[in-house]
Amino acid sequence: FILGCFFIGNTKCKGADLEYISQETANYAVQERGYDLPVDEVVKEEAIEDCKNVMNQMKAIYQKADKGTSSNVVVSETVMEEMQEVLKEKNVPVITSAPYSNMANYSKMEEFLFRAEQDLTGDIVLYRINRDGGIERLKFNYDGTDMYLLAVKAVWGMNDNPSIVYVSYTRIEEWKYTEKGWFGYTLCVPKYPEVSEAVDGSSMIRIKPLSDECREVSKRCVYL
């Protein structure tokens, strides 16, 4: 009887161990692929709440803006700049999706990147105002080895209330901050055979502001 109990108990322990090992292996596989990473619920809710609060700060500007007659709302560069003026009071980096838009409080973002280049840990939140009047909250975090991006996107929903479109947490595969002020990075993305078509995870953000003259020349000669 005693031996039987020992055998059953030992079998249960082995089963639990195998289940634990299987879960650890799955967690490792998720971390290795680098995308669709799990997000701590507290961190996630804080990011969502902050994103909604920021949207509400811009609500009056959005409501009075000329949004045209199309179902796909597009606000003017002037409206995006008004929103940027409001958000820059938070003393955080803010950009708009307008071509050659200068980043408000860019030195905060630059300081984070300079520290990361020296393998110093830190994080920074960057807000991007989109053409539909919504925003993206981009939180970059550097842990001393890898850089991660927690992205939250919000749009205007029913009755002009903020609505969260997505929350994603991704490891940045490679990144570089150039002498000319460009921050380029490539996110970890699904690859073949998981997907049949290539997914482009690359992005580039202008950090250092351009002079007014340079911006005007760029607008006339080049359009990104």
What function would you assign to each model-found segment?
Residues 1-3:
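Sec-dependent N-terminal signal peptides
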Residues 17-130, 135, 224:
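N-terminal export/targeting and maturation segments
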Residues 17-46, 50-53, 59-64, 134-224:
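Polybasic, proline/glycine-rich intrinsically disordered low-complexity segments
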Residues 5-22:
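Sec-dependent signal peptide cleavage junction
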